[in-house]
Regions:
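Short structural boundary motif marking the start of a folded domain
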Residues: 1-4
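Glycine-rich beta-strand-centered segment in the early N-terminal region that forms part
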Residues: 20-35, 48-97, 102, 129, ...
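Cytochrome P450 core scaffold surrounding the K-helix E-X-X-R motif
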Residues: 39-46
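Glycine/Thr-rich phosphate-binding loops of Rossmann-like dinucleotide-binding domains
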Residues: 92, 192, 259-261
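Mid-domain Rossmann-like dinucleotide-binding core that forms the NAD(H)/NADP(H) cofactor-binding site
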Residues: 134, 143-232, 236, 251
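Glycine-rich cofactor phosphate-binding loops and adjacent beta1-alpha1 units
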Residues: 174-176, 201, 217-298
Length: 298
């Protein structure tokens, strides 16, 4: 089968690899019909995340059709259409039973203290081959797949693999209640879903902060009040628009290495950041500028 395989920093290849096989009774094979590129993948491409294993298939977002299930998988069958959550969990340890799947004790082969297991990541996370391929092995299929209704197409379903849950739980952790004033910094895909989630939680006012017009326009279309941080100080503006009180909560959907305004980029911190990026990921535009990875959220 074909897969997107990482061989080294800036060395990503579409190549033929062996099809996966079920290696445990809890597993399943899914034929991918859609996959996505997360900005987290740029860390693996650029080398800003360590311990990537050569030959790892990238990707942790996917939708597909179940082709085969292990003997212990009783809730799925061949032909089921599913979305695959990005993290891997056993479903039966104490953490999984209380809903903390990312803290699963059993999924990560590096041990209980190794951290979250997920597809297409570094050695510390498994490693597990990812979902940017034609077929994928799902280790714990009973809890590692979610059935997709026929009326939901792939482009919508794949948002449930990683992006929407990330934005939703950001809003959930902020403990948004009816009428609360919320500020979302960063209006990329995760930020947009954080805005949508805040609306679902009946937030009163939602402020969206970014400097990219298309993203601000999308946030505005969702009903958010937008602030362009390249044109105005977001902290001062938030104070002015809330009578000096500020928002009830702030959701950071950016990370530490986002683009800054032109004014900030000329300052000492901006120069320090640029130097760090050059040292850590010098090959920002390799292969004769055939691709241009941006600053992925951390």
């Amino acid at each position: 089968m074909r897969a997107v395989v990482r061989h080294g920093i800036s060395d990503i290849r579409l190549e033929e690899v062996q099809e996966p096989q079920i290696n445990r009774p809890t597993g399943a094979i899914v034929r991918l019909t859609s996959s996505a590129i997360c900005r987290t993948d740029l860390h693996f491409i650029r080398g800003t995340v360590s311990n990537m294993v050569e030959g790892t298939i990238l990707g942790h977002e996917g939708v597909g059709i179940v082709e085969k299930v292990g003997s212990n998988v009783r809730n799925f069958k061949e032909g089921d259409r599913v979305v695959i959550p990005s993290t891997i969990a056993c479903g039966y340890c104490s953490y999984c039973r209380t809903g903390y799947y990312a803290q699963c004790d059993n999924a990560n082969p590096n041990g209980k203290d190794a951290g979250t297991a997920y597809y297409g990541g570094p050695k510390d996370t498994g490693p597990f081959n990812g979902l940017q391929c034609e077929k994928a092995l799902i280790p714990f299929a009973s809890v590692g797949m979610v059935k997709v209704p026929d009326e939901v197409n792939d482009s919508k379903a794949i948002m449930l693999s990683d992006i929407f849950p990330t934005g939703y739980f950001g809003a959930d952790m902020a403990r948004i209640k009816s009428g609360h004033t919320v500020a979302v910094f960063g209006c990329g895909p995760v930020g947009q879903f954080a805005i949508a989630s805040a609306k679902l939680m009946d937030a009163g006012r939602i402020f969206a902060i970014d400097a990219i017009n298309s993203r601000l326009e999308m946030a505005k279309n969702q009903g958010a009040e937008v602030i362009d941080f390249a044109k105005e100080d977001p902290v001062q503006t938030l104070r002015e628009l809330t009578g000096g009180i500020g928002p009830y909560c702030i959701i950071d959907a950016v990370g530490i290495d986002a683009n800054t305004s032109e004014k900030e980029s000329r300052g000492k911190e901006g120069e320090k950041f640029k130097k760090e990026v050059e040292e850590i990921a010098p090959k920002a535009s390799p292969h004769n500028s055939n691709w241009h990875p941006g600053n992925a959220p951390s």
